């Protein structure tokens, strides 16, 4: 199996990339989607989170309150560590299960914090045979997130600050030989670039299968 790691800052356009390649028949294993599924209403993981952290992790409907949790962990490192200790192993196992089920020519593993977790356990970067980094300027990131999520500038900056800087991400990408896709043009132009990259990854996957 050839695994293509997909990462990038918030608002860079990772979903646009994975959605398009998914339409080409490529399996996409998305860590964010898995995390949402695992914390859905009444899930075992949500029950565990409530017991470990308290009722504040739920909204008044009994659903996982992502906004409240996000606000809390920004200023509370201990709670963040507790949260990660519960969620990350479950997400990692679900990722491994989905990867094992993939039968497409190559498989995309989409992880927003792929580089940030490289020195932690589990290290999802170690699963990847190659990496595609989606890049956009900080200003474009802010504009896209504000339009998509309705966050104010302070909230957006807080999210960006949880990630490594754009400069660090690009430096790491170059060091490991990752592809860097600058996503600052139209959707049609993005798709044209992805058509080229898709053929490249098909060839890389075929070569990988011969080893």
Mark where each language-model region is.
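Walker A (P-loop) phosphate-binding motif
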Residues: 1-33
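Short, structured coil segments at secondary-structure junctions
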Residues: 24, 53, 126-128, 174-176
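Well-ordered beta-strand positions
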Residues: 27, 33, 130, 177-179
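Residue-level signal for inorganic ion chemistry
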Residues: 32, 83, 108, 156, ...
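ATP-dependent small-molecule kinase phosphotransfer cores
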Residues: 33-106
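An amphipathic alpha-helix signature
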Residues: 46, 50, 138-146, 153, ...
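ATP-dependent NMP and nucleoside kinases share a basic, alpha-helical "lid"
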Residues: 93-100, 109-144
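Small-molecule kinase domains that catalyze NTP-dependent phosphoryl transfer to phosphate-bearing small molecules
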Residues: 95, 103, 120-122, 147-211
């Amino acid at each position: 199996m050839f695994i293509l790691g997909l990462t990038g800052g918030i608002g860079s356009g990772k979903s646009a990339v994975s959605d398009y390649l998914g339409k080409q028949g490529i399996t996409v294993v998305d860590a964010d989607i898995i995390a949402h599924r695992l914390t859905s209403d009444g899930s075992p993981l949500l029950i565990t989170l409530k017991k470990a952290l308290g009722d504040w992790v739920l909204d008044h409907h009994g659903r996982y309150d992502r906004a409240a949790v996000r606000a809390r962990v920004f200023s509370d490192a201990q709670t963040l560590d507790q949260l990660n200790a519960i969620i990350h192993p479950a997400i990692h196992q679900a990722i491994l299960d989905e990867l094992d089920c993939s039968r497409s020519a190559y498989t995309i593993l989409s992880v927003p914090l792929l580089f940030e977790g490289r020195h932690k356990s589990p290290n999802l970067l170690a699963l990847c045979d190659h990496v595609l980094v989606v890049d956009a300027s900080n200003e474009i990131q802010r504009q896209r997130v504000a339009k998509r999520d309705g966050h104010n500038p302070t909230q957006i900056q807080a999210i960006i600050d949880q990630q490594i800087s754009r400069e660090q991400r690009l430096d790491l990408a170059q060091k490991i030989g990752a592809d860097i896709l600058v996503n600052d043009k139209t959707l049609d132009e993005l798709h044209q670039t992805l058509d080229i990259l898709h053929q490249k990854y098909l060839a890389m996957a075929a070569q990988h299968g011969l080893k």
